Swiss-Prot record:
Binding annotation for Mn(2+): D23, H205, H207
Biological process according to GO: catabolic process; L-leucine biosynthetic process
Xref: InterPro entries: 2-IPM_HCS-like (IPR050073), 4OH_2_O-val_aldolase (IPR017629), Aldolase_TIM (IPR013785), DmpG_comm (IPR012425), DRE_TIM_HOA (IPR035685), PYR_CT (IPR000891)
HAMAP family (alphabetical): HOA (MF_01656)
Catalytically driven reaction(s): (S)-4-hydroxy-2-oxopentanoate = acetaldehyde + pyruvate
Protein name, per record: 4-hydroxy-2-oxovalerate aldolase
Enzyme class: lyase
List of catalytic residues: H26
Natural source organism: Mycolicibacterium gilvum (strain PYR-GCK) (Mycobacterium gilvum (strain PYR-GCK))
């Protein structure tokens, strides 16, 4: 698969994608308004952000009982983003089994030009048809190997090869739980770079659950990653994503060219993105437990909701989710865990 038609300015060392309007949807419980999306896209575009991702937190078709309903239909937000951006390309996420081929076509018709297809890191084979369709439609393609911390670099590279052979132009090491630590990122990115060669680029998507989003992203770039994700103000699931404004500051200092103006992106984060956030993304006990136990970052809000519903500690829910090795799409099992903890509490109270 050729990487020649990837949107990549020769002056860049790395292409940045801001995921505030997709990963940030988890933190906002998918309640973005058109005004918020329009203002954020305009600010990111003006700062020089090459790619802006816009969709429900769980991708196309994610608005549902299981994941949470969108306040504004995602296709309307994709269209608005594409109409607002002057230079930035609009990307959209889709998960096989959640989104459909019709969703992909509609997103393209609404102005999306980069299709990012995500699977669990051991299930790349379920994305083959989706990559084929996206390339047939003329879309640029990106693959997400989620929960990449759960398998070895060698196994991850084999999964990346499946995506690349199917038409994926850049395969991401996705640290969905924010559980990877420095060398763990470098080893995985290096393995993918060695496997894919010129067939596809390699990217990295980090979270801040152990406070390593920026450091891990630097490790990824030094290991050969050409695409990096982040969110302004860490606006994302769990403790949030690597903050774009901090990434740009660090990249400037170490000589990594991105085409993004540091002062403009810092202004966008402070003056435009922050007011749209329901609260800051915190590196609190719940987030730390997710990073430490390897829990999918979008579980945070679901765990808090079940904690309030059943009167059990959210951090205990998250820790047990990690022990069970739950993955994205299994959020409903938090109810079973909550009931399990509740029964244990009642039994202990009876013994007392």
């Amino acid at each position: 698969m050729s990487t020649e038609d990837i949107y990549f300015n020769p002056i860049w060392d790395v292409r940045m994608t801001d995921t505030s309007l997709r990963d940030g949807s988890h933190h906002k419980r998918h309640q973005f308004t058109k005004d918020e999306v329009g203002s954020i896209v305009a600010a990111l575009d003006a700062a020089g952000v090459p790619v802006i991702e816009v969709t429900h937190g769980d991708g196309l078709g994610g608005s549902s009982f299981n994941y949470g309903f969108s306040k504004t239909p995602e296709q309307e937000l994709i269209k608005l983003a594409a109409e607002t951006a002057k230079e930035s390309k609009i990307a959209f996420l889709m998960l096989p089994g959640v989104g459909t081929k019709e969703d992909i076509k509609e997103a393209q018709n609404n102005g999306g030009s980069i299709c990012r297809i995500a699977t669990h890191c051991t299930e790349a084979d379920v994305s083959i048809q989706h990559f084929g369709l996206a390339r047939e439609l003329g879309l640029e393609t990106v693959g997400f190997l989620m929960m990449s911390h759960t398998i070895s670099p060698e196994k991850l590279a084999k999964q990346a090869r499946i995506m690349a052979d199917a038409g994926c132009q850049c395969v991401y090491v996705v640290d969905s739980a924010g559980a990877l630590v420095l060398e763990g990122v470098a080893d995985r990115v290096s393995a993918l770079v060695a496997e894919l060669g010129d067939d596809a680029q390699v990217g990295f998507h980090g979270h801040e659950n152990l406070g390593l989003g920026v450091a891990n992203s630097i490790e990824a770039v030094r290991a050969g990653a050409k695409q990096i994700d982040g969110s302004c103000r860490r606006f994302g699931a769990g403790a949030g994503n690597a903050p774009v404004e901090a990434l740009i500051g660090v990249f400037d200092k170490i000589g990594v060219k991105t085409g993004i103006d540091f002062f403009d992106i810092a202004d966008a984060a402070e003056e435009v993105v922050a007011p749209a956030m329901p609260a800051e993304c915190l590196l609190d006990r719940n987030a730390l437990i997710m990073g430490y136990s390897g829990v999918y970052s979008s579980f945070l809000k679901h765990a808090i909701r079940q904690s309030e519903r059943y009167g059990v500690p959210a951090h205990q829910l998250l820790h047990r989710a990690g022990q069970r090795k739950l993955i994205g799409g299994q959020e409903d099992q938090l109810i079973d865990i909550a009931l399990e903890i509740k029964r244990e509490q009642e039994a202990e109270a009876t013994r007392a």
